A protein has these predicted regions:
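N-terminal, active-site-proximal structural segment of metallo-dependent hydrolase catalytic domains
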Residues: 1-150, 163-171, 261-265, 359-362
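Short, solvent-exposed loop/turn segments at secondary-structure junctions
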Residues: 105-107, 139, 177-179, 213-216, ...
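Conserved beta-strand segments of alpha/beta enzyme cores
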Residues: 98, 156-157, 178, 207, ...
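Structured loop/turn residues at beta-strand edges in well-structured enzyme cores
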Residues: 95, 127, 153, 177, ...
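Active-site beta-strand/loop signature of hydrolases that rely on acidic residues for catalysis
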Residues: 98-104, 116, 120-144, 161, ...
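Structured beta-strand-rich core segments of catalytic domains in phosphoester-bond hydrolases
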Residues: 72-94, 111, 131, 135-229, ...
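Metal-dependent phosphoester-hydrolase catalytic domains
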Residues: 8-20, 25-58, 64-71, 183-185, ...
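Acidic/histidine-rich helix-loop elements
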Residues: 101-117, 139, 217-253
Length: 362
């Protein structure tokens, strides 16, 4: 009987590994053709956790079978490193520039009180970043002028762009370096968009791309239901219904984001083919294992994967934890000490910070 149990568990472990591989490499599927399968990368940590449980089981009951989950981790090393990088500590060398990417959720200005200092704007100013890319940077009512004054007093060069349609979304760049030009990257979306800026960074033209790609459009009710579901406070029927509802929304958003990612990637490649240095920031609304991440990061370095540690969750509302905000750079930059800064929680996103050091031309 014990032998039957051992072999049954071994088969289950092998099945799990195949599923973990399918989920870990789901970003190679085009969401236009396989929207459901392409969204499975969000569930990768659940499969990792299950494989860790198998490690514990084999350590206790049959250590010679430990090779099965270990092999699974080895086969999934590329997506595992994307999702959960580990790097030695690195101090930014002299001459590095500091880059900040932050979805500020309208600076949370709806909830500001009279004479209150906006904590998000204060954080941006005190970050002392050289280049700041903000998403959802539109301000509400009378607080806008006060926030603008704080930011513009620190940053002499800035461009704030509203969405060309009816969306309230704004994208902004604040910089210590001159902004030579700016333009919108053309792709279809009713609510989201991407901006490209050419900056003069210490005498060199650098393309900076600021993205806010298609939202998953989860309503407050959706997020509240997900919160209740993760706490075990929904019935089985309600949980199944809500899971399908959320999954359908994720798949639909993926189908819209895929051509946006293609457009941004093509735009960046055009500049890279001309030899221009590139820094990419933004809220991608997609996981590190997604088609979106893979396409936009193609030929670039993910600064968090290269120099950060841990899962680095940037979205943190309603018990939804995922890294959807990124900083990428071309290979003429070396990233240092990239981190998700959890000190400021007024937005539903945490900011991402990284130091970049220009590398000598090869």
């Amino acid at each position: 009987m014990k032998k039957v149990i051992i072999w049954t568990v071994a088969v289950l472990n092998i099945i799990l590994i195949f599923m973990m591989l399918a989920v870990g490499y789901s970003g190679y599927l085009n969401p236009l053709s396989h929207p459901m399968w392409a969204s499975l990368g969000l569930f990768f940590p659940l499969f990792l956790l299950a494989n860790v449980c198998f490690v514990a089981f084999w350590c206790i009951f049959r250590w010679r079978m430990l090779w099965i989950p270990v092999l699974g981790f080895l086969l999934c090393f590329p997506p595992l490193r994307l999702y959960f990088p580990l790097n030695p500590p690195s101090s930014p060398p002299e001459g590095s520039i500091k880059v900040l990417s932050y979805n500020v959720m309208g600076f949370d200005s709806r909830h500001m009180e009279e004479n209150e200092v906006n904590q998000i704007a204060e954080y941006v100013v005190e970050s002392d970043a050289d280049i700041v890319c903000l998403q959802e940077s539109g301000k509400w009512g009378k607080w806008g002028q006060r926030i603008d004054s704080m930011l513009q007093a620190r940053y002499p060069h800035y461009v704030a762009t509203p969405h060309p349609g009816k969306s309230p979304d704004h994208l902004s760049v604040y910089s210590r370096f001159p902004v030579l030009s700016s333009e919108m990257i053309p792709f279809e979306s009713n609510q989201n968009f991407s901006m490209a800026y050419v900056l003069n960074v210490n005498g060199e033209r650098v393309l900076v791309v600021n993205n806010h790609l298609e939202s998953n459009k989860l309503s407050y009710d959706d997020k509240d239901s997900f919160d209740l579901m993760t706490r075990g406070k929904l019935s089985n029927y309600s949980a199944k219904h809500e899971t399908k509802h959320i999954f359908d929304k994720l798949a639909e958003a993926l189908k819209k984001r895929a051509p946006q990612a293609d457009a941004v990637a093509a735009y960046i490649k055009n500049y890279r083919d001309k030899g221009m240095s590139v820094i990419v920031c933004g809220d991608f609304n997609d996981s590190p294992l997604s088609y979106t991440h893979r396409k936009v990061c193609d030929g670039l370095t993910d600064c968090y994967v290269s120099s950060g540690n841990g899962p680095g969750f940037t979205y943190h509302q309603s018990r939804i934890y995922v890294r959807i905000d990124n900083i990428f750079c071309s290979d003429d930059w070396k990233p240092y000490a990239c981190k998700v800064d959890t000190k400021v929680a007024q937005s539903d996103h945490y900011p991402v910070v990284c130091w970049l050091k220009k590398q000598p031309k090869r």
